[in-house]
């Protein structure tokens, strides 16, 4: 399988690159900075470019099987929302995918993005409330990404996480689609593992699993 990863230099992104290569995937890692990813492998291609450079984005996207984003917003507590660079990146990626393919798109978010399956519980409601109060720009990024995803023509999956700071991987991970009880904490390793496995899960198309440690 040929996969392109945006956000490859982040902590979750680097884990996902490593896991994908170990699984035999051909990986294209998109980075905004050269020499930012200290991984070498015969099946790894690194493309350096801006997140709004349509030429570079097209080079990274076309003729792949699945596109994955682990891009995340800056957690600023400033009340004024000036711009939404991560949402703008999603807009560009989605636009190119709709024009040239592929159709399969996975992105990382929080339960600030709501799923139609969501029922009232802590994991589906608290993240949105806290983000709106504490991180206005992050909240605005998530809501705009939600709008872009839900109105796209892609076969998308949104993997939702809360507090990916758990140091142990526990006994693996579980997911809730929002309609069953979920938990608040997850390790970055398990987030990456879930996203990798989601590339093979057609049953998660147009779903928003919340992943958490067992």
Residue spans for each PLM region:
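Conserved Rossmann-fold NAD(P)-dependent oxidoreductase catalytic core, especially the SDR/UDP-sugar
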Residues: 26, 34, 88, 92-137, ...
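Conserved catalytic-site region of short-chain dehydrogenase/reductase
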Residues: 76, 111-117, 164-167
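N-terminal Rossmann NAD(P)H-binding glycine-rich loop of SDR-like oxidoreductase domains
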Residues: 3-23
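NAD(P)H-binding glycine-rich loop region in Rossmannoid oxidoreductase-like domains
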Residues: 4, 35-92, 96-99, 199-203
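Conserved beta-loop-beta element that borders a ligand/cofactor-binding pocket
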Residues: 144-167
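Glycine/proline-rich active-site loop of Rossmann-fold NAD(P)-dependent oxidoreductases
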Residues: 119, 168-173, 198-207
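Core catalytic loop region at the nicotinamide-binding pocket of NAD(P)H-dependent oxidoreductases
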Residues: 156, 201-214
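Substrate-positioning beta->alpha
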Residues: 86, 141, 159, 186-196, ...
């Amino acid at each position: 399988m040929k996969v392109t990863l945006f956000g490859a230099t982040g902590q979750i992104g680097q884990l996902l690159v490593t896991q994908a290569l170990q699984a035999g995937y051909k990986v294209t890692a998109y980075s905004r900075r050269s020499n930012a990813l200290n991984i070498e492998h015969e099946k790894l291609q690194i493309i350096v470019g801006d997140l709004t450079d349509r030429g570079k984005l097209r080079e990274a996207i076309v003729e792949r099987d699945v596109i994955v984003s682990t891009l995340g917003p800056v957690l600023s507590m400033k009340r004024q929302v000036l711009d939404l660079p991560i949402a703008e990146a999603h807009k560009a990626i989605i636009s190119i995918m709709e024009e040239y393919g592929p159709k399969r798109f996975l992105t990382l978010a929080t339960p600030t993005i709501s799923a139609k399956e969501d029922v009232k519980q802590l994991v589906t409601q608290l993240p949105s409330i806290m983000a709106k109060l504490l991180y206005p720009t992050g909240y605005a990024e998530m809501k705009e990404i939600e709008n872009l995803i839900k109105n796209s023509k892609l076969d998308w999956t949104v993997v939702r996480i809360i507090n990916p700071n758990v140091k142990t991987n526990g006994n693996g991970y579980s997911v809730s689609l929002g309609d069953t009880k979920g938990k608040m904490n997850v390790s970055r390793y398990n987030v990456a593992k879930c996203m990798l496995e989601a590339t093979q899960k057609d049953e998660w198309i147009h779903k928003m699993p919340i992943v958490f440690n067992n």
